[in-house]
Each structure stands twice: as structure tokens, then as C-alpha cells.
Curated annotation (Swiss-Prot):
Origin organism lineage: Bacteria, Pseudomonadati, Pseudomonadota, Gammaproteobacteria, Enterobacterales
Name of the protein in question: UPF0391 membrane protein YtjA
Native species: Escherichia coli O139:H28 (strain E24377A / ETEC)
Keyword field: Cell membrane, Membrane, Transmembrane, Transmembrane helix
InterPro entries xrefs: DUF1328
Domain of life: Bacteria
Amino acid sequence: MFRWGIIFLVIALIAAALGFGGLAGTAAGAAKIVFVVGIILFLVSLFMGRKRP
């Protein structure tokens, strides 16, 4: 998940450097969404893994 977030962030940075504002905004938005979903899934797995049998 974090790998995809970093990939979208790099795409956004490259697109912004080349002047593609719309594409950079879209890729940055996708990176934020993927990053937040990754953090939420990490926290859920962290707390679900601590259950005692």
C-alpha cells in the first residue's frame, strides 16, 4: 500500500515539474487516499492481531 502511495507521489512531483497541473493534482490526491487507506489497514491489523485466544 505504501509503495503505491510513494509511486503516485513521485508521479505527481514529476508531473508538477513538467507543468501538468491537473495530472499532478490528480496523482497527489490518489497518493493521499492510498496512504490514508494504508495507515487505516495497518492500524486495524495492529489491533486485531493483539487479541488473546
